[in-house]
Amino acid sequence: MEESHFNSNPYFWPSIPTVSGQIENTMFINKMKDQLLPEKGCGLAPPHYPTLLTVPASVSLPSGISMDTESKSDQLTPHSQASVTQNITVVPVPSTGLMTAGVSCSQRWRREGSQSRGPGLVITSPSGSLVTTASSAQTFPISAPMIVSALPPGSQALQVVPDLSKKVASTLTEEGGGGGGGGGSVAPKPPRGRKKKRMLESGLPEMNDPYVLSPEDDDDHQKDGKTYRCRMCSLTFYSKSEMQIHSKSHTETKPHKCPHCSKTFANSSYLAQHIRIHSGAKPYSCNFCEKSFRQLSHLQQHTRIHSKMHTETIKPHKCPHCSKTFANTSYLAQHLRIHSGAKPYNCSYCQKAFRQLSHLQQHTRIHTGDRPYKCAHPGCEKAFTQLSNLQSHRRQHNKDKPFKCHNCHRAYTDAASLEVHLSTHTVKHAKVYTCTICSRAYTSETYLMKHMRKHNPPDLQQQVQAAAAAAAVAQAQAQAQAQAQAQAQAQAQAQASQASQQQQQQQQQQQQQQQQPPPHFQSPGAAPQGGGGGDSNPNPPPQCSFDLTPYKTAEHHKDICLTVTTSTIQVEHLASS
Protein backbone atom coordinates (compact mmCIF):
# COMPACT_ATOMS: atom_id res chain seq x y z
CA MET A 1 0.00 0.00 0.00
CA GLU A 2 1.38 3.30 -1.04
CA GLU A 3 1.98 5.93 1.55
CA SER A 4 -0.36 8.89 1.52
CA HIS A 5 1.07 12.18 0.26
CA PHE A 6 -0.87 13.94 3.03
CA ASN A 7 1.35 14.70 5.99
CA SER A 8 -0.54 13.49 9.08
CA ASN A 9 1.74 15.31 11.45
CA PRO A 10 -0.16 18.34 12.80
CA TYR A 11 3.13 20.19 13.20
CA PHE A 12 3.37 20.65 9.41
CA TRP A 13 -0.20 21.79 8.94
CA PRO A 14 -0.52 25.36 7.67
CA SER A 15 -1.65 27.96 10.10
CA ILE A 16 -5.18 29.30 10.08
CA PRO A 17 -5.30 32.19 7.57
CA THR A 18 -6.06 35.62 8.92
CA VAL A 19 -8.79 37.92 7.68
CA SER A 20 -6.38 40.06 5.66
CA GLY A 21 -4.87 36.97 4.04
CA GLN A 22 -8.30 35.73 2.98
CA ILE A 23 -9.08 39.11 1.45
CA GLU A 24 -5.88 39.07 -0.58
CA ASN A 25 -6.50 35.50 -1.76
CA THR A 26 -10.05 36.31 -2.78
CA MET A 27 -8.98 39.39 -4.71
CA PHE A 28 -6.26 37.40 -6.49
CA ILE A 29 -8.78 34.71 -7.50
CA ASN A 30 -11.18 37.35 -8.82
CA LYS A 31 -8.42 38.97 -10.81
CA MET A 32 -7.48 35.66 -12.44
CA LYS A 33 -11.13 35.00 -13.29
CA ASP A 34 -11.43 38.38 -15.01
CA GLN A 35 -8.33 37.66 -17.08
CA LEU A 36 -9.38 34.15 -18.09
CA LEU A 37 -12.98 34.94 -19.02
CA PRO A 38 -13.43 35.74 -22.74
CA GLU A 39 -15.88 38.54 -22.01
CA LYS A 40 -15.20 40.57 -18.92
CA GLY A 41 -18.53 42.36 -19.15
CA CYS A 42 -20.62 39.27 -18.53
CA GLY A 43 -21.69 38.23 -15.06
CA LEU A 44 -19.82 35.66 -13.06
CA ALA A 45 -21.30 32.23 -12.57
CA PRO A 46 -22.08 31.44 -8.92
CA PRO A 47 -19.42 29.26 -7.32
CA HIS A 48 -20.12 25.79 -6.03
CA TYR A 49 -19.45 26.98 -2.50
CA PRO A 50 -19.96 30.63 -1.58
CA THR A 51 -16.84 32.57 -0.76
CA LEU A 52 -16.82 33.16 2.99
CA LEU A 53 -14.96 35.75 4.98
CA THR A 54 -14.25 34.27 8.41
CA VAL A 55 -14.32 36.82 11.19
CA PRO A 56 -13.11 35.53 14.57
CA ALA A 57 -15.39 35.98 17.57
CA SER A 58 -12.76 38.08 19.28
CA VAL A 59 -13.08 40.66 16.49
CA SER A 60 -15.98 42.97 17.18
CA LEU A 61 -17.76 45.23 14.74
CA PRO A 62 -17.22 48.98 14.77
CA SER A 63 -19.50 51.22 16.73
CA GLY A 64 -22.99 51.28 15.29
CA ILE A 65 -22.53 48.15 13.14
CA SER A 66 -24.13 44.80 13.95
CA MET A 67 -25.14 41.73 12.01
CA ASP A 68 -28.59 40.15 12.03
CA THR A 69 -27.91 36.44 12.43
CA GLU A 70 -31.46 35.04 12.46
CA SER A 71 -30.48 32.04 10.40
CA LYS A 72 -26.83 31.03 10.51
CA SER A 73 -25.14 29.32 7.65
CA ASP A 74 -23.89 25.82 8.16
CA GLN A 75 -21.17 26.17 5.51
CA LEU A 76 -17.82 26.75 7.12
CA THR A 77 -14.30 26.95 5.88
CA PRO A 78 -11.97 24.04 6.59
CA HIS A 79 -10.17 25.90 9.41
CA SER A 80 -13.15 27.70 10.87
CA GLN A 81 -14.96 26.72 14.05
CA ALA A 82 -18.74 27.13 14.30
CA SER A 83 -18.71 28.13 17.94
CA VAL A 84 -16.30 31.03 17.52
CA THR A 85 -16.88 32.44 13.98
CA GLN A 86 -19.43 34.52 12.14
CA ASN A 87 -19.68 34.23 8.34
CA ILE A 88 -20.10 37.11 5.89
CA THR A 89 -20.55 36.41 2.18
CA VAL A 90 -18.11 38.35 -0.06
CA VAL A 91 -19.52 38.73 -3.58
CA PRO A 92 -17.04 39.79 -6.36
CA VAL A 93 -18.05 42.67 -8.64
CA PRO A 94 -16.73 42.13 -12.22
CA SER A 95 -17.06 45.76 -13.32
CA THR A 96 -14.77 47.14 -10.63
CA GLY A 97 -12.64 44.20 -9.60
CA LEU A 98 -13.51 44.84 -5.94
CA MET A 99 -15.87 43.03 -3.58
CA THR A 100 -19.19 43.80 -1.97
CA ALA A 101 -19.89 42.59 1.49
CA GLY A 102 -23.18 41.42 2.87
CA VAL A 103 -24.65 39.13 5.53
CA SER A 104 -24.69 35.55 4.38
CA CYS A 105 -28.14 34.80 5.85
CA SER A 106 -29.94 38.09 6.59
CA GLN A 107 -31.32 40.42 3.93
CA ARG A 108 -29.72 43.69 5.01
CA TRP A 109 -27.30 45.45 7.27
CA ARG A 110 -28.82 47.36 10.15
CA ARG A 111 -27.33 50.40 11.75
CA GLU A 112 -27.77 50.48 15.52
CA GLY A 113 -26.65 52.96 18.10
CA SER A 114 -25.06 50.32 20.29
CA GLN A 115 -21.75 50.68 22.04
CA SER A 116 -18.58 49.96 20.07
CA ARG A 117 -16.80 46.82 21.07
CA GLY A 118 -13.47 47.56 19.37
CA PRO A 119 -12.25 48.30 15.85
CA GLY A 120 -12.11 44.91 14.16
CA LEU A 121 -14.19 45.31 10.94
CA VAL A 122 -14.57 48.34 8.69
CA ILE A 123 -17.16 48.69 5.91
CA THR A 124 -16.83 51.46 3.32
CA SER A 125 -18.58 52.46 0.12
CA PRO A 126 -16.68 52.56 -3.21
CA SER A 127 -16.35 56.33 -2.91
CA GLY A 128 -14.19 55.85 0.20
CA SER A 129 -16.65 56.99 2.88
CA LEU A 130 -16.38 55.14 6.17
CA VAL A 131 -19.68 53.59 7.40
CA THR A 132 -19.12 53.94 11.15
CA THR A 133 -21.20 56.93 12.15
CA ALA A 134 -24.16 56.22 14.51
CA SER A 135 -25.93 59.50 13.92
CA SER A 136 -29.06 57.91 12.50
CA ALA A 137 -30.39 54.48 11.77
CA GLN A 138 -29.63 53.55 8.14
CA THR A 139 -30.15 50.34 6.23
CA PHE A 140 -28.02 49.13 3.32
CA PRO A 141 -29.47 46.51 0.97
CA ILE A 142 -27.38 43.51 0.13
CA SER A 143 -26.96 44.67 -3.49
CA ALA A 144 -25.24 47.87 -2.41
CA PRO A 145 -21.49 47.74 -3.14
CA MET A 146 -19.70 47.58 0.18
CA ILE A 147 -15.96 47.16 0.68
CA VAL A 148 -14.63 45.22 3.66
CA SER A 149 -11.28 45.69 5.39
CA ALA A 150 -10.43 44.09 8.72
CA LEU A 151 -7.52 44.17 11.16
CA PRO A 152 -6.72 42.34 14.40
CA PRO A 153 -8.07 43.89 17.60
CA GLY A 154 -6.05 46.55 19.32
CA SER A 155 -5.05 48.41 16.14
CA GLN A 156 -6.14 52.00 15.71
CA ALA A 157 -5.24 52.67 12.05
CA LEU A 158 -7.72 51.25 9.56
CA GLN A 159 -7.00 50.81 5.83
CA VAL A 160 -9.78 51.90 3.50
CA VAL A 161 -9.80 50.79 -0.15
CA PRO A 162 -10.69 53.85 -2.29
CA ASP A 163 -12.60 54.15 -5.53
CA LEU A 164 -10.86 53.27 -8.81
CA SER A 165 -11.11 56.85 -9.98
CA LYS A 166 -8.41 57.77 -7.47
CA LYS A 167 -4.83 56.74 -8.14
CA VAL A 168 -3.42 57.36 -4.69
CA ALA A 169 -4.87 55.43 -1.76
CA SER A 170 -6.06 57.45 1.20
CA THR A 171 -5.78 56.38 4.80
CA LEU A 172 -8.46 56.82 7.45
CA THR A 173 -7.44 56.88 11.06
CA GLU A 174 -9.87 56.26 13.89
CA GLU A 175 -9.25 56.96 17.52
CA GLY A 176 -10.34 53.76 19.30
CA GLY A 177 -11.54 52.93 22.80
CA GLY A 178 -14.21 55.57 23.36
CA GLY A 179 -17.97 55.14 23.17
CA GLY A 180 -20.22 56.70 20.62
CA GLY A 181 -18.22 55.52 17.58
CA GLY A 182 -14.97 56.89 16.27
CA GLY A 183 -14.78 59.43 13.45
CA GLY A 184 -12.45 59.12 10.42
CA SER A 185 -10.27 61.83 8.82
CA VAL A 186 -8.62 61.65 5.39
CA ALA A 187 -4.85 62.09 5.46
CA PRO A 188 -3.16 64.45 2.93
CA LYS A 189 -1.63 63.05 -0.25
CA PRO A 190 1.88 61.71 0.23
CA PRO A 191 4.77 63.49 -1.50
CA ARG A 192 5.87 62.35 -4.95
CA GLY A 193 8.76 59.97 -5.36
CA ARG A 194 9.48 56.44 -4.41
CA LYS A 195 7.16 55.35 -1.60
CA LYS A 196 8.46 53.50 1.41
CA LYS A 197 6.67 50.52 2.82
CA ARG A 198 4.88 51.73 5.95
CA MET A 199 4.06 49.63 8.97
CA LEU A 200 0.89 49.92 10.95
CA GLU A 201 0.82 50.20 14.75
CA SER A 202 -0.24 46.57 14.91
CA GLY A 203 3.04 45.51 13.28
CA LEU A 204 1.47 44.38 9.97
CA PRO A 205 2.42 45.96 6.64
CA GLU A 206 0.01 48.37 5.02
CA MET A 207 -2.18 46.81 2.31
CA ASN A 208 -2.53 48.61 -1.05
CA ASP A 209 -5.08 48.02 -3.74
CA PRO A 210 -3.43 45.89 -6.46
CA TYR A 211 -5.84 47.23 -9.08
CA VAL A 212 -5.01 50.90 -8.63
CA LEU A 213 -2.23 52.30 -10.81
CA SER A 214 0.28 54.60 -9.20
CA PRO A 215 2.12 57.47 -10.87
CA GLU A 216 5.24 55.30 -11.03
CA ASP A 217 3.33 52.78 -13.14
CA ASP A 218 2.36 55.51 -15.58
CA ASP A 219 5.98 56.59 -15.93
CA ASP A 220 7.10 53.04 -16.60
CA HIS A 221 4.41 52.69 -19.23
CA GLN A 222 5.71 55.76 -21.02
CA LYS A 223 9.26 54.45 -20.91
CA ASP A 224 8.20 51.17 -22.46
CA GLY A 225 6.63 53.04 -25.39
CA LYS A 226 9.92 54.89 -26.09
CA THR A 227 8.19 58.04 -27.29
CA TYR A 228 8.69 61.57 -25.99
CA ARG A 229 6.21 64.33 -26.75
CA CYS A 230 7.02 68.01 -27.02
CA ARG A 231 4.83 70.12 -24.74
CA MET A 232 4.80 73.07 -27.12
CA CYS A 233 3.87 71.52 -30.47
CA SER A 234 2.93 67.91 -29.52
CA LEU A 235 5.58 66.36 -31.77
CA THR A 236 6.77 62.91 -30.74
CA PHE A 237 10.37 61.66 -30.72
CA TYR A 238 11.98 58.28 -30.13
CA SER A 239 14.75 59.59 -27.88
CA LYS A 240 14.81 62.07 -25.05
CA SER A 241 17.83 63.90 -26.42
CA GLU A 242 16.09 64.63 -29.72
CA MET A 243 13.08 65.96 -27.87
CA GLN A 244 15.31 68.25 -25.78
CA ILE A 245 17.07 69.57 -28.85
CA HIS A 246 13.72 70.22 -30.48
CA SER A 247 12.32 71.95 -27.41
CA LYS A 248 15.12 74.53 -27.60
CA SER A 249 13.68 75.76 -30.88
CA HIS A 250 10.65 77.07 -28.97
CA THR A 251 12.72 79.09 -26.49
CA GLU A 252 15.75 80.35 -28.46
CA THR A 253 15.67 83.63 -30.37
CA LYS A 254 15.08 83.35 -34.12
CA PRO A 255 16.50 86.40 -35.89
CA HIS A 256 16.53 84.84 -39.38
CA LYS A 257 13.15 85.36 -41.03
CA CYS A 258 11.95 83.91 -44.32
CA PRO A 259 11.14 86.61 -46.93
CA HIS A 260 8.29 84.52 -48.38
CA CYS A 261 6.45 83.43 -45.24
CA SER A 262 6.29 84.23 -41.56
CA LYS A 263 8.61 81.48 -40.37
CA THR A 264 11.75 82.33 -38.42
CA PHE A 265 14.86 80.27 -37.69
CA ALA A 266 17.63 80.24 -35.14
CA ASN A 267 20.51 80.16 -37.65
CA SER A 268 21.13 80.87 -41.32
CA SER A 269 21.62 77.23 -42.32
CA TYR A 270 18.07 76.35 -41.30
CA LEU A 271 16.83 79.37 -43.22
CA ALA A 272 18.75 78.32 -46.35
CA GLN A 273 17.20 74.86 -46.20
CA HIS A 274 13.75 76.37 -45.79
CA ILE A 275 14.16 78.82 -48.69
CA ARG A 276 14.76 75.91 -51.04
CA ILE A 277 11.13 74.96 -50.50
CA HIS A 278 10.04 78.27 -52.04
CA SER A 279 12.71 78.39 -54.75
CA GLY A 280 12.45 74.73 -55.69
CA ALA A 281 16.22 74.19 -55.63
CA LYS A 282 17.25 70.55 -55.38
CA PRO A 283 21.05 70.43 -55.58
CA TYR A 284 21.44 66.86 -54.33
CA SER A 285 20.86 64.35 -57.15
CA CYS A 286 20.69 60.58 -57.02
CA ASN A 287 23.21 58.71 -59.16
CA PHE A 288 20.81 55.82 -59.75
CA CYS A 289 17.50 57.40 -60.78
CA GLU A 290 18.55 61.08 -61.27
CA LYS A 291 16.07 62.31 -58.69
CA SER A 292 16.92 65.53 -56.88
CA PHE A 293 16.44 66.50 -53.26
CA ARG A 294 16.63 69.68 -51.23
CA GLN A 295 18.60 68.23 -48.32
CA LEU A 296 21.49 65.79 -48.13
CA SER A 297 19.70 63.72 -45.50
CA HIS A 298 16.78 63.16 -47.89
CA LEU A 299 19.18 61.93 -50.56
CA GLN A 300 20.88 59.55 -48.13
CA GLN A 301 17.53 58.16 -47.08
CA HIS A 302 16.53 57.73 -50.73
CA THR A 303 19.71 55.90 -51.76
CA ARG A 304 18.98 53.12 -49.29
CA ILE A 305 16.24 51.78 -51.56
CA HIS A 306 18.61 51.32 -54.47
CA SER A 307 19.77 47.82 -53.68
CA LYS A 308 20.45 45.13 -56.23
CA MET A 309 17.13 43.45 -55.59
CA HIS A 310 15.26 46.72 -55.90
CA THR A 311 16.87 47.52 -59.25
CA GLU A 312 16.09 44.10 -60.69
CA THR A 313 12.47 43.98 -59.54
CA ILE A 314 11.36 47.61 -59.88
CA LYS A 315 13.32 48.46 -63.08
CA PRO A 316 13.40 45.33 -65.22
CA HIS A 317 13.78 47.11 -68.61
CA LYS A 318 17.47 47.52 -69.38
CA CYS A 319 19.02 49.55 -72.18
CA PRO A 320 20.99 47.38 -74.67
CA HIS A 321 23.52 50.17 -75.28
CA CYS A 322 24.34 51.20 -71.70
CA SER A 323 23.80 50.03 -68.13
CA LYS A 324 20.70 52.13 -67.36
CA THR A 325 17.44 50.45 -66.37
CA PHE A 326 13.86 51.74 -66.44
CA ALA A 327 10.55 50.90 -64.81
CA ASN A 328 8.49 50.68 -68.02
CA THR A 329 8.91 50.48 -71.76
CA SER A 330 7.91 54.09 -72.43
CA TYR A 331 10.86 55.42 -70.43
CA LEU A 332 13.13 52.96 -72.21
CA ALA A 333 11.83 54.13 -75.61
CA GLN A 334 12.56 57.75 -74.73
CA HIS A 335 16.05 56.79 -73.62
CA LEU A 336 16.77 54.81 -76.80
CA ARG A 337 16.23 57.96 -78.86
CA ILE A 338 19.43 59.34 -77.31
CA HIS A 339 21.44 56.47 -78.79
CA SER A 340 19.61 56.38 -82.13
CA GLY A 341 19.36 60.17 -82.54
CA ALA A 342 15.69 60.01 -83.48
CA LYS A 343 13.71 63.26 -83.04
CA PRO A 344 10.11 62.61 -84.07
CA TYR A 345 8.63 65.89 -82.74
CA ASN A 346 9.10 68.80 -85.19
CA CYS A 347 8.37 72.47 -84.60
CA SER A 348 5.85 73.99 -87.03
CA TYR A 349 7.50 77.43 -86.85
CA CYS A 350 11.23 76.79 -87.28
CA GLN A 351 11.34 73.08 -88.24
CA LYS A 352 13.43 72.15 -85.23
CA ALA A 353 13.14 68.55 -84.01
CA PHE A 354 13.01 67.22 -80.47
CA ARG A 355 13.16 63.81 -78.82
CA GLN A 356 10.31 64.40 -76.36
CA LEU A 357 6.93 66.08 -76.67
CA SER A 358 7.50 68.13 -73.52
CA HIS A 359 10.61 69.66 -75.06
CA LEU A 360 8.62 70.66 -78.13
CA GLN A 361 5.93 72.26 -75.98
CA GLN A 362 8.54 74.28 -74.13
CA HIS A 363 10.07 75.35 -77.42
CA THR A 364 6.79 76.50 -79.00
CA ARG A 365 6.29 78.97 -76.15
CA ILE A 366 9.22 80.94 -77.56
CA HIS A 367 7.30 81.50 -80.81
CA THR A 368 3.90 82.08 -79.24
CA GLY A 369 5.21 84.28 -76.43
CA ASP A 370 3.34 82.34 -73.77
CA ARG A 371 4.96 82.72 -70.35
CA PRO A 372 2.86 80.79 -67.85
CA TYR A 373 5.45 80.82 -65.04
CA LYS A 374 5.37 84.20 -63.31
CA CYS A 375 7.47 85.40 -60.41
CA ALA A 376 5.49 85.98 -57.21
CA HIS A 377 8.11 88.17 -55.55
CA PRO A 378 6.77 91.62 -54.56
CA GLY A 379 7.65 94.19 -57.20
CA CYS A 380 8.87 91.62 -59.75
CA GLU A 381 6.73 91.15 -62.86
CA LYS A 382 8.93 88.72 -64.78
CA ALA A 383 7.50 85.61 -66.42
CA PHE A 384 9.20 82.60 -67.96
CA THR A 385 8.44 79.86 -70.44
CA GLN A 386 9.91 77.06 -68.31
CA LEU A 387 9.58 76.17 -64.66
CA SER A 388 13.33 75.68 -64.31
CA ASN A 389 13.94 79.27 -65.42
CA LEU A 390 11.46 80.53 -62.83
CA GLN A 391 13.12 78.49 -60.11
CA SER A 392 16.52 79.86 -61.11
CA HIS A 393 15.10 83.38 -61.05
CA ARG A 394 13.65 82.90 -57.57
CA ARG A 395 17.08 82.05 -56.23
CA GLN A 396 18.26 85.51 -57.22
CA HIS A 397 15.67 87.03 -54.90
CA ASN A 398 16.45 84.56 -52.14
CA LYS A 399 20.22 84.77 -52.66
CA ASP A 400 20.35 81.01 -52.53
CA LYS A 401 23.26 79.54 -54.49
CA PRO A 402 23.33 75.79 -54.00
CA PHE A 403 25.58 75.01 -57.01
CA LYS A 404 29.18 75.48 -55.85
CA CYS A 405 32.48 75.16 -57.71
CA HIS A 406 34.93 72.66 -56.23
CA ASN A 407 37.97 74.58 -57.48
CA CYS A 408 37.38 78.13 -56.28
CA HIS A 409 34.29 77.67 -54.04
CA ARG A 410 32.18 80.13 -56.04
CA ALA A 411 28.43 79.51 -55.91
CA TYR A 412 25.73 79.92 -58.56
CA THR A 413 21.96 79.79 -58.72
CA ASP A 414 21.69 77.19 -61.50
CA ALA A 415 23.67 74.31 -62.95
CA ALA A 416 24.17 75.96 -66.35
CA SER A 417 26.05 78.88 -64.83
CA LEU A 418 28.20 76.46 -62.89
CA GLU A 419 29.09 74.56 -66.07
CA VAL A 420 30.07 77.78 -67.82
CA HIS A 421 32.20 78.72 -64.83
CA LEU A 422 33.93 75.35 -64.78
CA SER A 423 35.07 75.97 -68.36
CA THR A 424 37.14 78.93 -67.16
CA HIS A 425 39.39 76.61 -65.19
CA THR A 426 40.60 74.98 -68.44
CA VAL A 427 43.35 76.52 -70.60
CA LYS A 428 41.49 76.08 -73.90
CA HIS A 429 38.75 78.60 -73.15
CA ALA A 430 39.89 82.21 -73.32
CA LYS A 431 38.00 85.43 -72.66
CA VAL A 432 36.87 86.39 -76.18
CA TYR A 433 33.52 88.10 -75.44
CA THR A 434 34.34 91.75 -74.75
CA CYS A 435 32.04 94.54 -73.70
CA THR A 436 32.03 97.49 -76.12
CA ILE A 437 31.39 99.99 -73.34
CA CYS A 438 33.89 99.09 -70.61
CA SER A 439 36.07 96.57 -72.54
CA ARG A 440 35.57 93.81 -69.99
CA ALA A 441 36.05 90.29 -71.36
CA TYR A 442 34.03 87.17 -70.55
CA THR A 443 34.23 83.50 -71.40
CA SER A 444 30.65 83.10 -72.66
CA GLU A 445 27.94 85.11 -74.32
CA THR A 446 25.63 84.51 -71.34
CA TYR A 447 27.98 86.32 -68.98
CA LEU A 448 28.34 89.16 -71.46
CA MET A 449 24.55 89.59 -71.69
CA LYS A 450 24.28 89.68 -67.91
CA HIS A 451 27.02 92.28 -67.81
CA MET A 452 25.34 94.44 -70.45
CA ARG A 453 22.23 94.73 -68.31
CA LYS A 454 24.26 96.73 -65.81
CA HIS A 455 25.02 99.45 -68.34
CA ASN A 456 21.33 99.63 -69.37
CA PRO A 457 21.88 101.05 -72.89
CA PRO A 458 18.92 102.27 -74.99
CA ASP A 459 19.03 99.29 -77.34
CA LEU A 460 20.39 96.34 -75.38
CA GLN A 461 19.85 93.73 -78.08
CA GLN A 462 21.82 95.67 -80.69
CA GLN A 463 24.64 96.20 -78.26
CA VAL A 464 24.76 92.52 -77.47
CA GLN A 465 24.75 91.61 -81.16
CA ALA A 466 27.49 94.12 -81.88
CA ALA A 467 29.54 92.75 -79.03
CA ALA A 468 29.01 89.22 -80.30
CA ALA A 469 30.06 90.26 -83.83
CA ALA A 470 33.12 92.01 -82.46
CA ALA A 471 33.96 88.91 -80.49
CA ALA A 472 33.62 86.79 -83.63
CA VAL A 473 35.89 89.16 -85.58
CA ALA A 474 38.43 89.14 -82.78
CA GLN A 475 38.34 85.38 -82.71
CA ALA A 476 38.87 85.22 -86.51
CA GLN A 477 41.79 87.63 -86.26
CA ALA A 478 43.30 85.58 -83.52
CA GLN A 479 43.01 82.49 -85.67
CA ALA A 480 44.61 84.29 -88.66
CA GLN A 481 47.47 85.48 -86.49
CA ALA A 482 47.97 81.99 -85.22
CA GLN A 483 48.10 80.66 -88.79
CA ALA A 484 50.59 83.37 -89.82
CA GLN A 485 52.78 82.53 -86.88
CA ALA A 486 52.67 78.88 -87.83
CA GLN A 487 53.69 79.68 -91.42
CA ALA A 488 56.53 81.91 -90.24
CA GLN A 489 57.77 79.17 -87.99
CA ALA A 490 57.66 76.71 -90.89
CA GLN A 491 59.63 79.08 -93.13
CA ALA A 492 62.20 79.66 -90.43
CA GLN A 493 62.61 75.94 -90.00
CA ALA A 494 63.04 75.53 -93.79
CA GLN A 495 65.66 78.26 -93.93
CA ALA A 496 67.51 76.76 -91.04
CA SER A 497 67.52 73.38 -92.73
CA GLN A 498 68.83 74.93 -95.96
CA ALA A 499 71.58 76.75 -94.10
CA SER A 500 72.62 73.56 -92.39
CA GLN A 501 72.73 71.77 -95.73
CA GLN A 502 74.93 74.52 -97.23
CA GLN A 503 77.28 74.31 -94.29
CA GLN A 504 77.55 70.56 -94.74
CA GLN A 505 78.35 71.02 -98.46
CA GLN A 506 81.04 73.58 -97.70
CA GLN A 507 82.62 71.27 -95.17
CA GLN A 508 82.65 68.44 -97.69
CA GLN A 509 84.30 70.68 -100.31
CA GLN A 510 86.97 71.76 -97.86
CA GLN A 511 87.73 68.17 -97.01
CA GLN A 512 88.04 67.30 -100.70
CA GLN A 513 90.40 70.21 -101.28
CA GLN A 514 92.59 69.14 -98.40
CA GLN A 515 92.82 65.60 -99.77
CA GLN A 516 93.99 66.73 -103.28
CA PRO A 517 97.92 67.09 -103.86
CA PRO A 518 99.56 70.49 -104.43
CA PRO A 519 99.16 71.73 -108.01
CA HIS A 520 102.97 71.95 -108.74
CA PHE A 521 103.46 68.25 -108.09
CA GLN A 522 101.89 66.19 -110.84
CA SER A 523 102.50 62.72 -111.99
CA PRO A 524 104.34 62.18 -115.27
CA GLY A 525 102.08 62.11 -118.28
CA ALA A 526 99.28 64.00 -116.48
CA ALA A 527 97.63 66.64 -118.59
CA PRO A 528 97.88 70.23 -117.42
CA GLN A 529 94.77 71.82 -115.97
CA GLY A 530 92.70 74.18 -118.05
CA GLY A 531 92.78 71.98 -121.16
CA GLY A 532 95.15 72.13 -124.11
CA GLY A 533 94.01 75.58 -125.27
CA GLY A 534 96.01 78.78 -125.55
CA ASP A 535 95.14 79.77 -122.02
CA SER A 536 97.84 77.51 -120.58
CA ASN A 537 100.07 78.79 -117.79
CA PRO A 538 103.28 80.29 -119.21
CA ASN A 539 105.25 79.19 -116.16
CA PRO A 540 104.06 75.69 -115.49
CA PRO A 541 105.19 74.15 -112.22
CA PRO A 542 107.95 71.60 -112.40
CA GLN A 543 106.80 68.08 -112.81
CA CYS A 544 107.78 65.41 -110.37
CA SER A 545 110.21 62.85 -111.76
CA PHE A 546 109.23 60.15 -109.27
CA ASP A 547 106.79 57.42 -110.02
CA LEU A 548 103.72 57.66 -107.73
CA THR A 549 102.55 54.14 -108.39
CA PRO A 550 103.88 52.53 -105.19
CA TYR A 551 102.35 55.36 -103.03
CA LYS A 552 98.71 55.11 -102.22
CA THR A 553 98.14 58.52 -100.70
CA ALA A 554 99.09 62.05 -101.60
CA GLU A 555 100.57 62.67 -98.18
CA HIS A 556 103.28 60.13 -98.68
CA HIS A 557 104.01 61.53 -102.12
CA LYS A 558 104.29 65.04 -100.74
CA ASP A 559 106.86 63.99 -98.15
CA ILE A 560 108.98 62.29 -100.74
CA CYS A 561 108.91 65.33 -103.00
CA LEU A 562 110.01 67.63 -100.22
CA THR A 563 112.88 65.33 -99.30
CA VAL A 564 114.12 65.13 -102.89
CA THR A 565 113.88 68.89 -103.36
CA THR A 566 115.90 69.52 -100.22
CA SER A 567 118.60 67.12 -101.23
CA THR A 568 118.82 68.71 -104.72
CA ILE A 569 119.30 72.16 -103.26
CA GLN A 570 122.07 70.90 -101.05
CA VAL A 571 123.84 69.27 -104.00
CA GLU A 572 123.64 72.45 -106.06
CA HIS A 573 125.04 74.46 -103.15
CA LEU A 574 128.01 72.14 -102.81
CA ALA A 575 128.69 72.25 -106.51
CA SER A 576 128.73 76.01 -106.66
CA SER A 577 131.14 76.25 -103.83
From Swiss-Prot:
Extent of Gly residues compositional bias: 175-185
Positions of region (Disordered): 171-225, 501-550
Keywords for the protein's UniProt record, in alphabetical order: DNA-binding, Metal-binding, Nucleus, Phosphoprotein, Repeat, Transcription, Transcription regulation, Zinc, Zinc-finger
GO CC annotations on file: nucleus
Keyword flag NADP: no
Modification type Phosphoserine: residues: S214
Start-end of Low complexity biased regions: 501-515
Zinc finger (C2H2-type) boundaries: 228-250, 256-278, 284-306, 317-339, 345-367, 373-397, 403-425, 433-455
Record Pfam families: zf-C2H2, zf-C2H2_6
Coiled-coil boundaries: none
Subunit architecture: Interacts with BCAR1.
Function: Transcription factor that binds the consensus DNA sequence [GC]AAAAA. Seems to bind and regulate the promoters of MMP1, MMP3, MMP7 and COL1A1.
Protein name per Swiss-Prot or TrEMBL: Zinc finger protein 384
Originating species: Homo sapiens
